[in-house]
Amino acid sequence: MISPVLILFSSFLCHVAIAGRTCPKPDDLPFSTVVPLKTFYEPGEEITYSCKPGYVSRGGMRKFICPLTGLWPINTLKCTPRVCPFAGILENGAVRYTTFEYPNTISFSCNTGFYLNGADSAKCTEEGKWSPELPVCAPITCPPPSIPTFATLHVYKPSAGNNSLYRDTAVFECLPQHAMFGNDTITCTTHGNWTKLPECREVKCPFPSRPDNGFVNYPAKPTLYYKDKATFGCHDGYSLDGPEEIECTKLGNWSAMPSCKASCKVPVKKATVVYQGERVKIQEKFKNGMLHGDKVSFFCKNKEKKCSYTEDAQCIDGTIEVPKCFKEHSSLAFWKTDASDVKPC
């Protein structure tokens, strides 16, 4: 017969053994929660793993029951981030990103000539969608340009309906008698506006003066304006120093003011000189005189080295100075050699 004490002791040990088979707090899984979450569980109690918002379960079981052994089964459940739709290409722009997974943020930029129509960044949400919506790169446009007073639009071709695209240009012209101050060409900028407009102003010039020993012709009208022209000429024996035609400039003055300079009489009876790179007889080439500004080179002798060299002489308003080294060759001194026939130094 079994002792009652032994039976009581055995029951106690059995109770202690069963009570000691509780399950511990379950392992933490990244990006997941456990319900209910306690420090220990009695055999038969159930727990459920759930992925946090923005994550989805991959493989493994979600529900577990605490076994009599007190050991939770190995959990192979994984919670992985939701993946938003591919957004790595932005037409006429660029996307900066690492991944398209929750909760990453991507940013956007547009090429020159385009602007972001939408936000410059978007975040992958818990639902696996981009927020805010993905932007687009739209072309920068400028409205039709304003036309300055006293100007006309000379060149303008809209390329976006009525508007112009970035770097498109427009060219202006001023009305007659008006001068342009500023650039005649404006450009559509990255800000969607045009560069600075030019200004057209009426410009008058005084009547040009007649030069001494010459004459001037200009339009027969009460006032001379921008771009009007005047022509000059000189009387016989004089030549024009400056342009034959001048123009009224945007500053209200003339582009030049020529004068009439006297011609020069040939200073010697006979000599071979260099004119514009060629040897010529001065008495033949300039039988009617040398014009103001004409330049010739006279031949001179170096007696010590027995060679020749040249020195220049120029007609300046009726005066020309012959180089002192030049010796005019007399036709009677036929035994002497002219300097132009001596070998150069």
From Swiss-Prot:
Q: Which domain of life is it from?
A: Eukaryota
PROSITE patterns in the record = SUSHI
Pfam families, A to Z: Sushi, Sushi_2
Disulfide-bond pairs as recorded:
C23-C66, C51-C79, C84-C124, C110-C137, C142-C188, C174-C200, C205-C248, C234-C260, C264-C315, C300-C325, C307-C345
Q: What effect is documented for mutating K229E? A: In allele APOH*4
Name by which UniProt lists this protein: Beta-2-glycoprotein 1
Q: Which residues are glycosylated?
A: T33, T149, N162, N183, N193, N253
Keyword Glycoprotein recorded: yes
Q: Name one GO cellular component term.
A: high-density lipoprotein particle
Q: Which organism is it from?
A: Pan troglodytes (Chimpanzee)
> Where is it expressed, tissue-wise?
Expressed by the liver and secreted in plasma.
- Write the record's keywords in alphabetical order, separated by commas: Disulfide bond, Glycoprotein, Heparin-binding, Repeat, Secreted, Signal, Sushi
Give the span(s) annotated as Sushi-like.
Answer: 263-345
Q: What does this protein do?
A: Binds to various kinds of negatively charged substances such as heparin, phospholipids, and dextran sulfate. May prevent activation of the intrinsic blood coagulation cascade by binding to phospholipids on the surface of damaged cells.
Q: Quote the subcellular location field of this record.
A: Secreted
Signal peptide positions (record):
1-19
Q: Which GO terms describe its molecular function?
A: heparin binding; identical protein binding; lipoprotein lipase activator activity; phospholipid binding
Q: Tell me the Gene3D superfamilies matching this sequence.
A: Complement Module, domain 1
Tell me where in this chain the Sushi domain is found.
21-81, 82-139, 140-202, 203-262
**Record keyword Signal present:** yes
Please list the GO biological process terms of this entry.
blood coagulation, intrinsic pathway; negative regulation of angiogenesis; negative regulation of blood coagulation; negative regulation of endothelial cell migration; negative regulation of endothelial cell proliferation; negative regulation of fibrinolysis; negative regulation of myeloid cell apoptotic process; negative regulation of smooth muscle cell apoptotic process
